[in-house]
């Protein structure tokens, strides 16, 4: 069964929160296209409504809203999601994924459309990093 990370962006505060989606809750996301609204309860955020804005698969290939289905395609693009040209008029063939969430997707991006009673800070707490003696770095070689 596929597990993925849901990155929830809060437009009011400008912060993003990572939520792990595992088990049977994943099935409620599979088949949903970019732009669809989902209930936050499926991600452990009761009272919230989320809008899917994109994602990427296991190889880092981004989802693009104008490619239908769950497929990977080599598309000639001149800008937008997946390609940012350095000069005007440049086009390039890029590998992109369709707009539907499939089992190969490992990250789904979403924004908050409607807020619940509890703030996101409480529902998706920040994970603290463990720091060693050198501040998380390897000791210096002599």
Swiss-Prot record:
Keyword terms, alphabetized: Ribonucleoprotein, Ribosomal protein
Family matches, as InterPro entries: Ribosomal_eS6, Ribosomal_eS6_arc, Ribosomal_eS6_CS
A GO cellular component term found in this entry reads: ribonucleoprotein complex
* One Pfam family in the UniProt entry: Ribosomal_S6e
Stretches with biased composition (Basic and acidic residues): 118-132
| Record flagged with keyword Protein biosynthesis | no
NCBIfam families for this protein: PRK04290.1-3
The entry's protein name is Small ribosomal subunit protein eS6
Organism (species)? Methanocella arvoryzae (strain DSM 22066 / NBRC 105507 / MRE50)
Q: Write the gene name.
A: rps6e
